[in-house]
């Protein structure tokens, strides 16, 4: 069974993330969305909320599981019996960073492989940071995040 982990902070999950999840779920037998606890950032949503939002927008995908983790990604993969890291790429700048991370992860565990998936062109500009910025100033986020969570993002952005 090919089990992959798609890690990220997903704060909030965007349509670009969902695109990678939907496409990745067709490539792997099981896709675990690893929602990371980033102690260096104060998130828009708490970790438990992010997990629930992702579950809400991925409930139609049967081979997806959503879990939170902290610590090393490699340790999370081992605990999940996964050998593959799935990463979405928007631009060359993403590749430079992710390539270095893939090399580090492979150094920590040579059995781990990183698979890069290009984001669909219509989402190549999209990031959680840009969604938060637009929502904070009252801009329209339709088409940027899944429709099921638009009200959650707007409500939280006004706090």
From Swiss-Prot:
Which Pfam families does this one have? CTP_transf_like
What does it catalyze? (R)-4'-phosphopantetheine + ATP + H(+) = 3'-dephospho-CoA + diphosphate
CDD domains for this protein? PPAT
Kindly list the places in or outside the cell where this protein is found, as annotated in its UniProt entry.
Cytoplasm
UniProt GO cellular component terms: cytoplasm
- Site Transition state stabilizer: list residues: 17
Top-tier EC class: transferase
The record's annotation in PANTHER family points to: PHOSPHOPANTETHEINE ADENYLYLTRANSFERASE (PTHR21342:SF1)
Family as reported in the entry's similarity comment: Belongs to the bacterial CoaD family.
Provide the alphabetized UniProt keywords: ATP-binding, Coenzyme A biosynthesis, Cytoplasm, Magnesium, Nucleotide-binding, Nucleotidyltransferase, Transferase
EC nos: 2.7.7.3
Which co-factors does it depend on? Answer: Mg(2+)
* Self-association and partners: Homohexamer.
Q: Chief location of this protein?
A: cytoplasm
Q: Where is the signal peptide?
A: none
Q: Where does substrate bind?
A: 9, 41, 73, 87
**What does this protein do, in the record's words?**
Reversibly transfers an adenylyl group from ATP to 4'-phosphopantetheine, yielding dephospho-CoA (dPCoA) and pyrophosphate.
Name of the molecule in the record = Phosphopantetheine adenylyltransferase
The scientific name of the source species is Clostridium botulinum (strain Eklund 17B / Type B)
Q: In which pathway does it act?
A: Cofactor biosynthesis; coenzyme A biosynthesis; CoA from (R)-pantothenate: step 4/5
Give the molecular function GO annotations. Answer: ATP binding; pantetheine-phosphate adenylyltransferase activity
The UniProt record gives the binding positions of ATP as 9-10, 17, 88-90, 98, 123-129
| Single GO biological process annotation from the record | coenzyme A biosynthetic process
Q: NCBIfam families under this entry?
A: coaD_prev_kdtB, cyt_tran_rel
Q: Which InterPro entries match?
A: Cyt_trans-like, PPAT, Rossmann-like_a/b/a_fold
């Amino acid at each position: 069974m090919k089990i992959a982990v798609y890690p990220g902070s997903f704060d909030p999950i965007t349509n670009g993330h969902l695109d990678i999840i939907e496409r990745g779920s067709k490539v792997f037998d099981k896709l675990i969305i690893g929602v990371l606890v980033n102690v260096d950032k104060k998130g828009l949503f708490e970790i438990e909320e992010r997990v629930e939002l992702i579950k809400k927008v991925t409930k139609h995908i049967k081979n997806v599981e959503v879990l939170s983790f902290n610590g090393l990604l490699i340790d999370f993969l081992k605990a999940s019996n996964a050998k593959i890291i799935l990463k979405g790429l928007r631009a060359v700048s993403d590749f430079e960073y992710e390539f270095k991370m893939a090399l580090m992860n492979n150094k920590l565990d040579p059995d781990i492989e990183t698979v890069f998936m290009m984001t669909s062109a219509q989402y190549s500009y999209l990031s959680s940071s840009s969604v938060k910025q637009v929502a904070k100033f009252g801009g329209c986020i339709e088409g940027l995040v899944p429709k099921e969570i638009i009200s959650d993002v707007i409500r939280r952005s006004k706090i």
